[in-house]
């Protein structure tokens, strides 16, 4: 089978990894992990979106980008740099933005720790994180339903596809 891109398999792997990890999806309290945009209107206090740039958008969102270059003699071997967009979000019914900012930072820290600790090449989908966690944009707000803090970040990987 020809592999056009590692993006779909890598997103699937990350969703499973984060959902089952004791510091994220299996934590107490758990972080709800979404593969892309949520399919429910329910707000969860701690959320990690994989393959999403803006949880508030009703428009189609970019989940990832990839760039390929030739990696070897011949036509088949290519290196692929994959960037997967993610958002960590913490929300509560209280007015304390500070506690939500700390909670969002905790989700990001747990993701970064997993990125550094993986020894499986992320299920065989990559050569290495390049650099792994990159470009974090922090935002916060206090709304009529409570305080919210977000950290939008990119996960960057290098993989080899083809021959």
Language-model features: locations:
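Small/polar-rich, solvent-exposed N-terminal microdomains that initiate assembly or binding
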Residues: 1-73, 122-130
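Acidic-leaning, charged glycine-interspersed low-complexity segments
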Residues: 25-26, 104-162
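Short, charged, solvent-exposed linker or helix-capping segments at domain edges/interfaces
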Residues: 61-62, 97-99, 163
């Amino acid at each position: 089978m020809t592999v056009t891109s590692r993006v779909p398999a890598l997103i699937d792997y990350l969703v499973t990894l984060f959902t089952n990890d004791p510091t994220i999806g299996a934590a107490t309290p758990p972080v709800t992990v979404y593969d892309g945009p949520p399919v429910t209107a329910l707000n969860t206090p701690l959320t990690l979106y994989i393959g999403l740039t803006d949880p508030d958008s009703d428009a189609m969102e970019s989940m990832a980008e990839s760039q390929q270059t030739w990696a070897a003699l011949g036509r088949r071997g290519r290196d692929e740099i994959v960037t997967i967009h993610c958002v960590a979000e913490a929300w509560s019914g209280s007015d304390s933005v500070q506690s939500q900012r700390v909670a969002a930072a905790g989700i990001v820290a747990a993701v970064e720790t997993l990125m550094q600790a993986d020894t499986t090449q992320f299920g065989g989908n990559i050569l290495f994180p390049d650099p792994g966690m990159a470009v974090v944009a922090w935002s916060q707000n206090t709304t009529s339903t409570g305080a919210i803090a977000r950290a939008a970040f990119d996960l960057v990987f290098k993989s080899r596809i083809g021959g």
